Amino acid sequence: MATPPPLRRVAALLLLLVAAASTPTARADLVVTRADRKVDLTSHIVRVLTSLKVENSGPEAVSQFLLAFPNVQAKNLAAIRAFGTEEKVKGPSMVLPIEVVQPSGVPPELTFFSASLSKPLEKGKTLHLDVLTVFTHSVQPFPEEITQAESQLVVYQDSAQYLSPYPVKVQTLSIRLPGGRVESYTKYPNTKLAESELKYGPYEDLPPFSYSPMVVHYENNNPFAVAKEVIREIEISHWGNVQITEHYNIAHGGAKLKGEFSRIDYQSRPYIRGVSSFRHLIARLPPRAHSIYYRDEIGNISTSHLWSDSKKTQLEVEPRFPLFGGWQTTFTIGYGLPLQDFVFNSDGKRFLNITFGSPVEEILIEKLIVKVVLPEGSKDIDISVPFPTKQEQEVKYSHLDISGRPVVVLEKLDVIPEHNLYFQVYYRFNNISLLREPMMLITGFFLLFMACIVYMRTDMSISKNSPSYLAKVQWDEVQSIIQQIQAIFNQCLAAHDKLETSLHELSRSGDVKSCKVARKTADAQFKELAKELKPLLTSLQSSSQSYQIWPKVEELVAKERELQDKLMTRHSTVVDSFEKKLRGQDVENRIAAQQQKVAALRQEVESLLEYISEI
């Protein structure tokens, strides 16, 4: 079997801890008489609950308690909370403020937090302290790649002894595992593995900065749901609704899939041929959530399930495909909430009171962006969040907005379920602003109806005596004349084609008589068309609207007459040649120049006709 990752950094840390333990400091005034740690490894998010009993053995009162973590562990610390109460004092535990500190004379490979006590701990007094720490990326898949049929094995590294700057009289460690097999674990005296629980200790009389490296290599097939980014938009409408839209980009953060994926094997035996994958996520929505939808880039996803009662609304999100290690998917969840359940009034202000994180269970969000869209006209905006976040403000424009809607943007990294706490956004909003958009709609429809009435009752026609009307009439007349002229010239071109056809028939049959009849018919048609064209040209020339088109028409007439002459001349030459019984080559030589001229003129006439038709 492969060996878990080396512990070189842990060994180096041990040397520093030994040096730190030999440094006398004022921290020796406190003694941890008992330390009980409970580590929950059932998920990919590690939760450690440390119960401490602390005694002040020094001569002076102490107002703070130091918590120490190795840097390699502190960099993955997502949340830390401390609760304390003095012995023999009745009442609930007090939440203690915690901040990062750097005491003098300690190794830089350690990160220290200071818990400020609610009141100084006097000499000889005892304090009960509960510390909850939550770590991300502390459970690593090993091996890093597995096949579809293999279970997922992970490794967790910690210390079997409680790392503290104070001496510890008695300490125990209990590690809760998800079940399944345990490949290996570090064994020390008083180590016991019973079913899904691994215990170390009790260990007594430990000096400050005691550290015993411990590694657990075990099976964990629970969903390693890691969201690369989640954008959560909360839009407030004072017409009675809070609309929430959440965009997810989720990946499986466990061991990557090695080899090919077989859907047939997965569907036939999903709990054997896909034990390390996850096919659904659970989102716990507020009780009165409504208008719930779940979709991705393709569209609505129908493979979701919804349950609701008076206490909660549960949505089971099932992607289109199961997620194995390294795979990812994107989807969107949207739902509405009653306004009166989440927006309240206080001291002349309104405030939104809603949870910060995602409703999806056991999900790690590497980057969460929460956008609170306030109604247009909101001002005096204040934000209260129970933990540090990056805060910005922007403006969003929607339907009928004039100045835009203020948007509060909150951004936080490494968000876990413990961050799903309530936060508040305070703002001032005048109820009169509610009427702005309805009044805009009413005014718009009123103006539209008034415009329709005015339009229906107003004579919009152009006067027959106005210059524009007269110009339009004249232009219509010009267009009518142009259409008639085009029709005449099209007839001329048709007559040209008949002459060409008669020559082809002559070369085929040698019928000179029929060819002469065709020429005579064409000549008569040309004369008739010229008579029809003459009055049209006169009318066109006299119109004031034809100044642009008349030069082209005049050029067209000249080219057409020249084309007719050339056609008739060529026709006569060919007929005479046939009557004289000349050879075909001699005929071609006689009409070659005429043929080129006829083709060029025909092209010019057609171009002029096309130009006139476009005008």
Swiss-Prot record:
Alphabetically ordered keywords of this record: Acetylation, Endoplasmic reticulum, Glycoprotein, Membrane, Signal, Transmembrane, Transmembrane helix
Alphabetized PANTHER family for the sequence: DOLICHYL-DIPHOSPHOOLIGOSACCHARIDE--PROTEIN GLYCOSYLTRANSFERASE SUBUNIT 1 (PTHR21049:SF0), RIBOPHORIN I (PTHR21049)
Coiled coil feature spans: none
GO annotations of cellular component type: oligosaccharyltransferase complex
Residue numbers bearing the N6-acetyllysine modification: 187
Organismal lineage: Eukaryota, Viridiplantae, Streptophyta, Embryophyta, Tracheophyta
Gene designation per UniProt: OST1A
Entry protein name: Dolichyl-diphosphooligosaccharide--protein glycosyltransferase subunit 1A
Glycosylation sites: 300, 353, 431
Involved pathway(s): Protein modification; protein glycosylation
Localisation: Endoplasmic reticulum membrane
InterPro entries attached to this UniProt entry: Ribophorin_I
Endpoints of the signal sequence: 1-28
Organism of this sequence: Oryza sativa subsp. japonica
